[in-house]
């Protein structure tokens, strides 16, 4: 059929498709795995520690791990987009590459619903949402330490209820994605407790 031919044509147009086929076809599965593994790792590092981690230290640790790579890739992608625009009069892949969207990326808020469309290093939207989930995690550490898996089950059921209640239909994409990311993150913590 025409649609299957069109799909094959689109696949072959992707850069290095023959070598990167697996990542093109199944790469989307990495995002849920990323959130779930992050939840597990955070539980391992921060829960039931004898020494409490201060909020300041927690967020300094997060910033130190995330920001250097984020900033480096943002600069590289920006330079590549400028080069592309100079030689082809067009940006590549993501087209909202202006100063406004640069600052959204710079401050890790490009996935929070302020954007007009995809821009610069768009896959970083996952990390911009994870920053919110990190804050939620830090706030819930005392409850996780006190109630353990019971707290996760209640939190997860509340998030699931929000999903199934229809409330989410009124939400923006960011709120819906944030709910999904939180469920995946806390699923990783659930696995930690098992």
How would you label these PLM feature ranges?
Residues 1-47, 67-70, 105-109, 180:
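Functionally critical transmembrane alpha-helices in membrane proteins and complexes, commonly lining
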Residues 3, 41-44, 76-84, 140, ...:
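Residue-level signal for alpha-helical transmembrane segments in multi-pass membrane proteins
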Residues 5, 48-50, 82-90, 146-149, ...:
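Transmembrane helix-loop junctions in multipass membrane proteins, especially transporters and channels
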Residues 11, 15-18, 51-55, 59, ...:
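Juxtamembrane loop-helix boundary motifs flanking transmembrane segments in multi-pass membrane proteins
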Residues 28-31, 46-83, 93-104, 133, ...:
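Transmembrane alpha-helical segments and their boundary/interface "anchor" motifs
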Residues 33-38, 66-71, 129-142:
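Conserved beta-strand->loop/alpha-helix structural units within folded catalytic cores of enzymes
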Residues 34-36, 42-43, 47, 72-77, ...:
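Hydrophobic alpha-helical segments of integral membrane proteins
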Residues 97-194:
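Aromatic-enriched alpha-helical transmembrane segments of multi-pass intramembrane proteins
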